Amino acid sequence: MTVLCVVGPTASGKTKMAVALARQLNGEVVSVDSMQIYRGMTIGTAAPTAAEMEGVPHHMIAVADPAEQWSAARFCQAADACIQDILSRGKLPVLAGGTGLYLDALIRGDDFAPGCQGGRTRLRLQQELWELGPREMLRRLEAVDPETAARLHLRDEKRILRALEVYEETGEPMSRRDKRGREKPDRYQALYIGLNFRDRADLRERIDRRVDEMVRRGLLQEVQALLAGGLPRDATALQAIGYKQFLAVADGTATAEQAVEEVKLRSRQYAKRQLTWLRRNPAIHWIYWDKEPDFPAALQNATDFLTAHGLG
């Protein structure tokens, strides 16, 4: 089963390329973005508008209440159902997104452990984290899964809790499960188109322009609407880049100017982490916008690659 993945850092033009390729290849787009799933959060997540979708069906956008907390497992189960539906209708799933963890899990067909829906074990571990701190939780993980613990830092609180949860629910270290998962064939045969810039300054400029556009379109008003709708201030959705900073503006603890600069900084840092993740994948065919004369040329570059690999 073949899928097409359009990947790249934030603000790299994934939506436009994914839509263009979906139109050419009789495809439908599946968003692989951990925040675009939430309703009422289109501006800050840069979810595609109806005009940007150009009539191409999109999935996994605005499907969840922002008060809900979606685990990687829940996301992948829902996205996989979308992929299977698209394939059953003879169309090509075009996966577009920047949440690398979710994309990798989807392609591999990860066998998620019990408890990953946010059950009693997770809630208890979260309470212990609040009471004891990340250092103690990481120490616990070192005792039962030293291989996973060695890859994590104190700030990786969610991953520490996830690894502890897997061990407590299954009696098996996450590192062993991961190793077994790497040994089995991937669920999907994936072709990857990656979008980026050779000159980092160009990507930084794109990110800054996108943030300015979000503010112009009403990011602050979007945050205020979420709060007015009863969304708790500590909801996971409001911890996302953009929302966290403008929540402070809504609360009067920061100015809009301070929030804008913070969002730009955090977005650049996020883009760097995305690229670090993506560069581990040698299968990605990279297209650099600053090396292509225009969008049609970049699209042709992508099409030529896909045709050479039997898609097109």
Regions found by a protein language model. Give the residues of each.
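Phosphate/pyrophosphate-binding catalytic cores of soluble transferases and nucleic-acid-acting enzymes
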Residues: M1-G312
